[in-house]
């Protein structure tokens, strides 16, 4: 029975006879043109093993779109597609290397010839195992052919034009497990692993450095050739390796010793050349370092200029005219430029530190300031003691050497000279002991002088700090006294009560004593304070006029200082420390506490 492919009415009648709903729309061809030479619908593209997805027949279709399959005509049967609205048939998990499929739902009257006729379109069939219960197993030649066979799952098969139940069936195609497939797949995997190992081995052998050529055995002819190569700079490395191998093999003997010596001498002549080359390379390295440092300095200067531009743009005069986005970009750029500048600056400073470390101590010494007369005298004394100490140590070593020589001569001399040499030895030992004692005394004196020198340095530092504080206090007190002099005059009694400081001199004294007691938190006696003031007075050529005598200039007295400090109760406080004979009066600075009380 032959039906025109393009006649929709004829196909609708045939499908009604089978009890199936007609597919397609009236007035349109249900099936595309069929090419009998292909044995399949022309709408299906040709299948090749090189297609992606192991040669799956249908192209990728969106999951929400139903698959419309075509009717397939064979010589003895016809395959009708399933309803496209039904879900696709379920399949089991694909075994590795699967080439065998399970085909169920065959017609009862179906033969092996019909099965071959239907599935030979999917590919070459190796074997068919048919069962009596309407199913069979088909083994294909390649794995991609299994995917073609799965495409026929769900089709209705009809033998000829019969509508008998034994001549119809619904095909169910699924993956099947077969030991032959698994064995072939394992063999293939092992073959691929062998190929991969071989490829890696070849790659490793290719990357491996070539083995050195074998060294020839020693002979007079080869010795002359190596001697000539040793004189050539380009062939020196090869020749010296040969020479080293010969010496390690034990080729040196009496007959060949002169030849080997001449070759070693030739190798030694290259030392000066290598030293000159090293010096040349070092010079080039220094020049490259200098160029790099100069280039880095230029880059750093440009970075500084860029950062300065950003900072000037960030000032309010120009900043207010930029938009918000422009300000954000300028801030980000400025931050990035500062980070890069800091990195370059650290690198440049590291180079400079390395250069400074290479310099000798004499080049990095700086000239110190001139010391005071007492300090310079102590330094000169310490240097003199050090020189004397060194000279005594050298004399001591000389005496020890003489003693050793005398001991050696004493064993060789005759016995008749023994009394004289023993006496001389005793004298030398006594002189040695005296020198050792003198050396110990000099060392102790040297240590004392050094300790005294350190103490004087510390005192000088403290005095300099106090002088600075004194000048600051003097300026502050002078400004305050000028401001107070502009106020109206008040009675003498009220002035004495409200202002305990009577003159500018006393104000300066108060400032100096406050500074002194501030650095002595545990207080100081009145004698200690006056001695400090007198010493400071001698240093600064400054004296306080006494209000009790008619002499204009007198040294600072204890009573004046104590009366001044007694009037300032919120600034100075007197405390008693100790018990019994160790009882002592100490003055402390309490100016900050007085601020809270006032």
Curated annotation (Swiss-Prot):
UniProt entry tagged with the keyword Plastid: no
Alphabetic keyword roster: Biological rhythms, Cell membrane, Coiled coil, Copper, Electron transport, Glycoprotein, Growth regulation, Membrane, NAD, Oxidoreductase, Secreted, Transport
Regions annotated as coiled coil: 264-299, 352-476
Cofactor: Cu cation
Gene Ontology molecular function terms on file: oxidoreductase activity; RNA binding
EC number in record: 1.-.-.-
Known role: May be involved in cell growth. Probably acts as a terminal oxidase of plasma electron transport from cytosolic NAD(P)H via hydroquinones to acceptors at the cell surface. Hydroquinone oxidase activity alternates with a protein disulfide-thiol interchange/oxidoreductase activity which may control physical membrane displacements associated with vesicle budding or cell enlargement. The activities oscillate with a period length of 22 minutes and play a role in control of the ultradian cellular biological clock.
PANTHER family named among the record's database cross-references: ECTO-NOX DISULFIDE-THIOL EXCHANGER, ECTO-NOX DISULFIDE-THIOL EXCHANGER 2
Family: Belongs to the ENOX family.
Protein name: Ecto-NOX disulfide-thiol exchanger 2
Source species of the chain: Mus musculus
């Amino acid at each position: 029975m032959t039906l025109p492919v393009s006649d929709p009415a004829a196909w609708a009648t045939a499908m009604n006879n089978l009890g199936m709903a007609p597919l397609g729309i009236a007035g349109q061809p249900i099936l595309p043109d069929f090419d009998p030479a292909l044995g399949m619908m022309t709408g299906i593209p040709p299948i090749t093993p090189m297609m992606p997805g192991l040669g799956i027949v249908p192209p990728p279709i969106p999951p929400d779109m139903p698959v419309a399959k075509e009717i397939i005509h064979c010589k003895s049967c016809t395959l009708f597609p399933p309803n496209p609205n039904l879900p696709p048939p379920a399949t089991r998990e694909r075994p590795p290397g699967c080439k065998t499929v399970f085909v169920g739902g065959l017609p009862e009257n179906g033969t092996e010839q019909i099965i071959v006729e239907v599935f030979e379109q999917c590919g070459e069939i190796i074997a068919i195992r048919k069962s009596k219960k309407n199913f069979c197993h088909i083994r294909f030649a390649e794995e991609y052919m299994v995917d073609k066979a799965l495409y026929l799952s769900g089709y209705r098969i009809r033998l000829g034009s019969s509508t008998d139940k034994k001549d119809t069936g619904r095909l169910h195609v699924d993956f099947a497990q077969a030991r032959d497939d698994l064995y072939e797949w394992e063999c293939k995997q092992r073959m691929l692993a062998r190929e991969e190992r071989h490829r890696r081995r070849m790659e490793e052998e290719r990357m491996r450095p070539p083995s050195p050529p074998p060294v020839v055995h020693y002979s007079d002819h080869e010795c002359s050739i190596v001697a000539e190569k040793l004189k050539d700079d380009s062939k020196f490395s090869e020749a010296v390796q040969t020479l080293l191998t010969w010496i390690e093999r034990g080729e040196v003997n009496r007959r060949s010793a002169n030849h080997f010596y001449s070759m070693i001498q030739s190798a030694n002549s290259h030392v000066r050349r290598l030293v000159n080359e090293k010096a040349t390379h070092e010079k080039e390295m220094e020049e490259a370092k200098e160029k790099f440092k100069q280039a880095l300095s230029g880059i750093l200067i440009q970075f500084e200029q860029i950062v300065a531009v950003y900072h000037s743009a960030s000032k309010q005069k120009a900043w207010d005219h930029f938009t918000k986005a422009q300000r954000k970009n300028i801030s980000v750029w400025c931050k990035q430029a500062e980070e890069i500048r800091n990195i370059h600056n650290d690198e440049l400073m590291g180079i400079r530190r390395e250069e400074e470390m290479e310099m000798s101590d004499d080049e990095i010494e700086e000239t110190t300031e001139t010391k005071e007369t007492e300090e310079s005298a102590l330094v000169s004394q310490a240097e003199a003691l050090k020189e004397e100490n060194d000279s005594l140590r050298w004399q001591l070593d000389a005496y020890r050497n003489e003693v050793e020589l005398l001991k050696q001569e004493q064993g060789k001399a005759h016995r008749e000279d023994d009394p004289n040499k023993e006496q001389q030895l005793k004298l030398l030992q006594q002189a040695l002991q005296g020198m050792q004692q003198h050396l110990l005394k000099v060392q102790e004196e040297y240590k004392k002088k050094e300790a005294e020198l350190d103490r004087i340095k510390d005192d000088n530092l403290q005095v300099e700090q106090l002088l600075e504080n004194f000048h600051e206090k003097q300026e502050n007190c002078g400004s305050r006294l000028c401001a107070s002099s502009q106020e109206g005059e008040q009675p003498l009694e009220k002035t004495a009560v409200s202002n305990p400081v009577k003159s500018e001199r006393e104000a300066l004294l108060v400032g100096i004593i406050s500074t002194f007691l501030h650095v002595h938190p545990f207080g100081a006696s009145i004698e200690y304070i006056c001695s400090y003031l007198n010493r400071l007075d001698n240093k600064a050529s400054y004296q306080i006029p006494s209000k009790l005598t008619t002499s204009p200039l007198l040294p600072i007295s204890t009573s004046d200082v104590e009366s001044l400090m007694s009037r300032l109760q919120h600034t100075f406080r007197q405390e008693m420390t100790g018990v019994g004979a160790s009882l002592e009066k100490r003055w402390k600075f309490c100016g900050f506490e007085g601020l809270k009380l006032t």
